[in-house]
């Protein structure tokens, strides 16, 4: 199945099973704005809990904060967002559609890379176990030709970004003969910068109102509170401050479902360190964050690091954790060494000292900062994309069928356990309700009695429920039930009194945390 078709199925599945809805749908929707449904909000909360607890519970020197969305407008001048938070945009004169110039070029690079990958995959199928990929890449003429094209374009693109050369970005688009996806033409305007911040007025009258911004990131709320947290918590460097919260960006090119939205949620941690140690801590958090992603069990081959070609104005090192989505490798998390840029800027613009006094060295300094920043919505999409499977199964009648299943890690699954009476009589519904009542304070359970047991299993598979308990006629005799495992479809009988112990152990977040130590 083509990857584009897989992605369309993911989007349709999310709507059909209550994960994600188009916002304001009865009014024909609002572009790049989405709502999370009954299962989506549970998965989202579980992802946030996994991140929050892995930061706060597993690190004694990391604490949390919840800062306001509205902040003093000078904060955004100090941070550089007013002057430098821009995207390079280009319009197609025929379709009147607007695109990010850098994204058009990145997609061209991805197309060249796809050609290389297809050549390698074809050769691998042809030669089987004897295939030497390294040798093939080094000797195959088509691979070498495309690799040279990729290297040349990548180098030219990196220079243009580093120099903020908008004319060169346009020239690359022209030279690569990149066409508008809508019109199919190459009739492009000049490239220009566009600021991404939303603004509004705070105050009762237009004349007396103050222009403020909806925060484009959560990090600045941490920086302006860092000294409050340090002093009130008696924190010693190195220490971190973590936050989960909404951010807003006026993305002109917002697409790929919830991957890029105008209203989104971030999970960020700013780690304050002694100047001179920031790159060591950068490497430490770089490896720790990749480990966090891989602990979910989606395959290490589906992750990679992407070093930044152009560093942001505040950074001296930066790397992205990328995941292989159906539409290619894309960023899910960024790790940045932000130096002392933010705190020094806020010192300058506020006139307040933001220095840390080091009692061991008997000196004061502005700490350097290492940041980890992950998008909740992108992480959500990663989990759904990695978990979605279609497989052929043989039914009890011997007929072939397609089973759609979300193999969400049990600790993140919205519903942990479905309790299903085999029939709606003989006291089975009452027994099922009794079991749910005894478990509902331990984990999220769902009762379902509609349709055949086979259809109910399929429905829970599509939701991503890791375990189903079935109450049948034998339950009345020996107080046992059937427990079915989602991923294997295997079933076994267990005593009712063992349900809590068995399920709780398998859905515990501790199973993920153990992989991080």
Question: How does the language model describe each region?
Answer:
Residues 1-517:
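NTP/phosphate- and nucleic-acid-binding module
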